């Protein structure tokens, strides 16, 4: 339904071309469809009109991450946090940016803050689970990925991350089930295409599934 939502957002911008909230909604939907250059241009307009808006700056931060501009992304997320301390999204973004700089402890802490501020958001719990997996805290990783699955049964993200985690702890059959589930749910993703541009791409799922099938012994199904 994202193209339809984008059409509605475009009409809203036509009706109120100087409204930063209409602009940033259009930008986020464009970003969700993978149209990053267009999203960036629209977000620039929103930022010119509302440079101190937390949603505008958080979106700007994710767009900077997509353009591999880590420093600018971090600055945008820090601005967004200062402008609205109740939102989890900029903490998630800052956590991703910190991971890119190998500042893993600080990254985990930011992602933890996102889940504390908005505990019912599945996506934040997915990324916190993945963060704990990256720092080899498997029990915590398992806990938050399980919670993410409960919070949003239609989100493929926690199943994808849990497949990788389960394979790493020698539970390949369960890993296959999780990865198949993530592929089945793939078309139900919302908000961002490839979930903030990390590694949610369907091709990545297929490649991971092939490797896991091979390790389980289903070579004929592997890549």
Tell me what each language-model feature is.
Residues 2, 36, 70, 104, ...:
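TPR-repeat structural position
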Residues 15, 49, 83, 116-118, ...:
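Structural marker of alpha-solenoid helical repeat scaffolds
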Residues 20-21, 54-55, 88-89, 122-123, ...:
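Helix-start (N-cap) detector for alpha-helical repeat units in TPR-like alpha-solenoids
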Residues 32-33, 66-67, 100-101, 134-135, ...:
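Register position in tetratricopeptide repeats
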